[in-house]
């Protein structure tokens, strides 16, 4: 029985109790949101060692970090380090997007390296296995696709991106629609190309009920992928994106009827003034399903800094209802990220998430309140304790030392020290 089914029966599961205690929220309220499908819980029944995480209404905005090998760079040790660094700096979940090497072994190794939920995109494996055989991606059969999905579910992944909304109808529409960037979703493109080649319907859409059966068996959260998300600002909010969104909304309702947990993925690249409207539209179209966004990236002309462009968009999206932020690293659009890129990406996304969480949770705001008090007293030891990135705190303090109580920016001209000294004198 899934978390959704248990919640509908009025049962507060052990996972709900764990999450409620961790987040400092009421377990019964969490149960009600899970029962409605407004909140999902990541915890595959076979992933015994995972610490469950909730995404959606009434809980904190969460951050995901993507890692994984590529066909050009297969370094499993590096990916394990990335996973551990991501978790260290605050990633709530990890997605293994590996496309090179022994994908089964890599996935299992990553899952055992961390205790957070792990997500995947199974069709990547189906596509990679075709290339490994010297075949074209479009030669994969429906059986190949389903085999990959079931393998990932059995291995214990907690959520999977399935591009169910890339239908034959929307692919036909794509032929008549001009886009600046085209399709940028790998999984979505694999399916679109397959549909164009064979003239057949997307197997995951055609046999959606079977997908629901599999997901229900393992209580895997289906992350309904946005295969037609905008890959550049000019494409934001176009006909293809919105058509897919409404398809996903219908599929969310079918999943809920089947007792399967679902969330919906969103853009992408979106001008800053459109983000609020896009998030609110998605929430309406999907009946308040948890919304998982990649960024959104708010400008396309700063490659090397897309962790920042994404954090800006992510904060606005989260403030307007997005529940789950997929980090973006400085390497986005340029190459496979290294460990340092992962660290920077996680921190940027955590800043965006925390900026919103502190407006909703007293415990989160208290951290900032305590930091303000510490700064007001020039209490550097306390500021260090409260810092989210302690290594960076120490690094900059050592690089730019001062002989004063203040920092090397102001030294004896420190505003805080001056006014504190003057007020102390007045009190005497």
From Swiss-Prot:
Q: Extract the InterPro entries matched here.
A: ThiC, ThiC/Bza_core_dom, ThiC/BzaA/B
Q: What's its EC?
A: 4.1.99.17
Cofactor(s) needed for function: [4Fe-4S] cluster
Q: Where does substrate bind?
A: 66, 95, 124, 163, 185-187, 226-229, 265, 292
Q: Which residues are [4Fe-4S] cluster-binding?
A: 407, 410, 414
Q: Which Pfam families does this chain map to? A: ThiC_Rad_SAM
Q: Which reaction does it catalyse?
A: 5-amino-1-(5-phospho-beta-D-ribosyl)imidazole + S-adenosyl-L-methionine = 4-amino-2-methyl-5-(phosphooxymethyl)pyrimidine + CO + 5'-deoxyadenosine + formate + L-methionine + 3 H(+)
The record's family statement is:
Belongs to the ThiC family.
Q: Which NCBIfam families match?
A: PRK13352.1, thiC
UniProt-recorded name of the protein: Phosphomethylpyrimidine synthase
- Source species of the chain: Thermococcus kodakarensis (strain ATCC BAA-918 / JCM 12380 / KOD1)
